[in-house]
Amino acid sequence: MINKLYTFFFSKGILSKINNLLLNACLRARGYNNFNNNKESGESFFIRNILAPTNPKIIFDIGANVGIYSNELLQKTDAKIYSFEPLPTQYELLKKLSVYGDRFVAENKGIGAENKTLTLHFNPTKPTHASFSEDVKKVSYIKNEMKTEVEVVTLDSYCAEKSIKIIDFIKIDVEGFEPEVFKGASEVFNKIKPKFIQIEFNWHHLFRNTSLLYFSEKLPNYDCYQLIYDGWIKRDPKDPLTNIYHFSNFVFVRH
């Protein structure tokens, strides 16, 4: 009966604005489109209540931008942070975190599927939208009309070169380039076995033909949690409601 009433009343075109408001409210309640700050996105909750109590020693921040997330990690944990940012202008700002001494390493390079030089597409007025993928230009709000050539390495080769044997947490926010990061990180995922892996999931992945289920299947020994406002909830990656192409952060936790 309730479903019939809902269909009868809310399917009316005159109520479309109300429907959209309700839909957006529901999406935000589930952890989507909460991007204004780290508390709203659930990232501060994760660092404070989940990550920090495990006393992490080594953390990788892939797609660090100017270091807002790296800075919070440095403040809330005693870990050493390796931060990767390929866009030169953002890297120069990221380097300011060098005040943390040997606890912080900034790398002006990207992480991908191969060791090679790639074209980074960007908008100087919206540097957080920079991406190695041209597909993300199909996202209506992305206007990456400029480009630069930058160095890209695999996570596997970087860890081998630096003799890194332990990684407690990897955060990946690379504007739709996450599948390539995964392709170059098989040794890290299977041998180093980080406890936590966070990825940003967004509209970009629709145009990369990638779902959250795709990432989950690459991490068979991990449970999936979606960050919500000041919290997190365990999700089933096979559920369509977990694969909505709106901004959200998911954390994979090793069994």
Locations of regions flagged by a protein language model:
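Phosphate/nucleotide-binding beta-alpha loop and adjacent structural elements of enzyme active sites
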Residues: 1-255
